């Protein structure tokens, strides 16, 4: 049963362990303007929790925009849902967004798999239940037109240390080598990240496959990791590292990494045109 009602913003709580990052971007500023002029046109979706509060399933940005504007109540659709049912809806709705980071998708798929498992869809890794596991992975990807294997590979990213997962989000490490790195223990992953910090190089797919194989054979050492990472790669991208404290004042608050990169590129292009005009004038 669904109930449409007005709920105070102070009683609306963010979804616990929400895998999707809140972005304070241009779209959010436009949302604030829209709500300021027209109000909340689409009710947010919530479920009742303890102490007279409600957990937001869909509409975190609308709720935050209302808080910024000092709007005290928001139209809400209250659904009678368990935590697991709410998780499935949260994931399916948010994965329809235009921009979803690999880390967001990874944690979202894992949350949905766990929710389906709790609802009775077995995802155990035992051989006798492997077929059920595959079917559950297929169900998770069904809403987003992704295969069960793709879903399972995204979930592997949740085994990465945060530093490497951030490199995946930034596009510095590609998806397939990141999946292979996820099979290494955190200590070895920190070794790989340490080499990246010192030398500004990331591993290729073939290098991560070799590291994974060496680890499975009990032969992966710090020296082996350094030797593999030090190999020349024809397709290695060059990155310019700029301390963010030197340029953060020029960014709007809560810019994403992609937005920061685009801003810096536009600034460099603008400055280059300025120098060319000065040269032509002089």
Regions found by a protein language model. Name each.
Residues 97-184:
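Alpha-helical interaction elements
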Residues 1-79, 85-99:
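Short, charged/polar connector segments at secondary-structure boundaries
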Residues 144, 148-265:
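Amphipathic alpha-helical extensions and coiled-coil-like segments
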Residues 24-27, 31, 61-62, 87, ...:
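Helical mechanochemical/support elements of P-loop NTPase systems and associated helical scaffolds
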Residues 272-282:
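Short acidic DE-rich linear segments
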